[in-house]
């Protein structure tokens, strides 16, 4: 299954979190699994906050890019359109709230999951967990 980011045109593929054309970024890949989206990411040692744990900014960055990709995919799905069709649906984050419930170990795979909560016009609300 193609990741959402595989459908981004080169002109918008420079994002630090999800851009395939940014060699220094996370280059996340997001796919549908039923009614939710999933990204899998393995932190590197340079993502450390304190020994053994991932930096909180990394978590927020992963949530941000995973969520905007989900918003676009949800709009395509609602419209019954292919993700390569024009005009393109693109989103930026209007609000990001993260509750850090416990430190995130750096030595394993992070699984980011997102569910659509609401589409109202051009506004898409999602809920994401790591």
Task: List each model region and its residues.
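Non-catalytic linker/capping segments at the edges of enzyme domains
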Residues: 1-51
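Short, surface-exposed charged micro-motifs
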Residues: 27-29, 99, 113-115
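Hydrophobic beta-strand-centered segment that forms part of the acyl-chain substrate-binding groove
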Residues: 70-111
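Preference for bulky hydrophobic residues occupying beta-strand positions
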Residues: 39-41, 98, 114, 128
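Hydrophobic residues on conserved beta-strands that form the core of alpha/beta folds
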Residues: 27, 93-95, 125
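A general secondary-structure signal for short beta-strands and their flanking turns/coil
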Residues: 34-36, 93, 109, 123
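HotDog/MaoC-like acyl-thioester-processing domains
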Residues: 1-10, 103-130
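A conserved, well-ordered hydrophobic junction motif at loop->secondary-structure transitions
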Residues: 38-74
């Amino acid at each position: 299954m193609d990741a959402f980011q595989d459908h981004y045109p080169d002109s918008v593929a420079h994002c630090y979190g999800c851009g395939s054309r940014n060699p220094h970024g996370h280059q996340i890949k997001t796919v549908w699994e039923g009614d939710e989206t999933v990204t899998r990411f393995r932190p590197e040692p340079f993502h450390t906050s304190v020994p053994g744990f991932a930096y909180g900014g990394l978590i927020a960055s992963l949530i941000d890019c995973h969520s905007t990709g989900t918003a676009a995919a949800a709009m395509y799905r609602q419209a019954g359109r292919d993700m390569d069709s024009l005009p393109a649906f693109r989103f930026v984050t209007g609000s990001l709230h993260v509750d850090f419930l416990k430190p995130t170990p750096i030595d394993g795979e992070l699984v980011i999951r997102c569910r659509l909560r609401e589409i109202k016009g051009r506004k898409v609300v999602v809920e994401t967990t790591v």
